Amino acid sequence: MSMTDNVADMLTRIRNAYKSKLINVSFPSSKIKTSILEVLQKEGYIKNYTSTPKDNISYTEVTLKYSANGDASICEIHRVSKPGKRVYSAIKDLKGYYNNMGIYILSTPYGVMSDREAHIKNVGGEVICKVF
């Protein structure tokens, strides 16, 4: 089976793992996925992630984060910019997602970063996904 949107597949696997109350989730690695996971870890949405080779393919295993009473740290995670319809935004057009309780993840000329970091660097770019 060929996949056209690997990032959407990763986000769906993470969303489904949280719904199933799993501790870990794994999927094939790529540079963009690793960059997105780095932002999610820096913002406190996941515990950690590791890349391991399996059968000549590198897989990433993500350890999900839950609160003390078992609530997921991610309520919603959705793809915004898709292969068929790219979404770009200037930094002045990005308002705080869920009253600044959530984040947008952007691909900018300076790398993949959250909207908060993009505001500090005053740079816009492609809106990859939104997380709350």
From Swiss-Prot:
Protein name, entry field: Small ribosomal subunit protein uS8
GO MF annotation: an example: rRNA binding
Source organism of this protein record: Rickettsia bellii (strain OSU 85-389)
Assembly notes: Part of the 30S ribosomal subunit. Contacts proteins S5 and S12.
GO biological process, one term: translation
Lineage: Bacteria, Pseudomonadati, Pseudomonadota, Alphaproteobacteria, Rickettsiales
Pfam families: Ribosomal_S8 (PF00410)
Family under the similarity heading: Belongs to the universal ribosomal protein uS8 family.
Family annotation (InterPro entries): Ribosomal_uS8, Ribosomal_uS8_CS, Ribosomal_uS8_sf
NCBIfam families linked: PRK00136.1 (NF001109)
Task performed by this protein: One of the primary rRNA binding proteins, it binds directly to 16S rRNA central domain where it helps coordinate assembly of the platform of the 30S subunit.
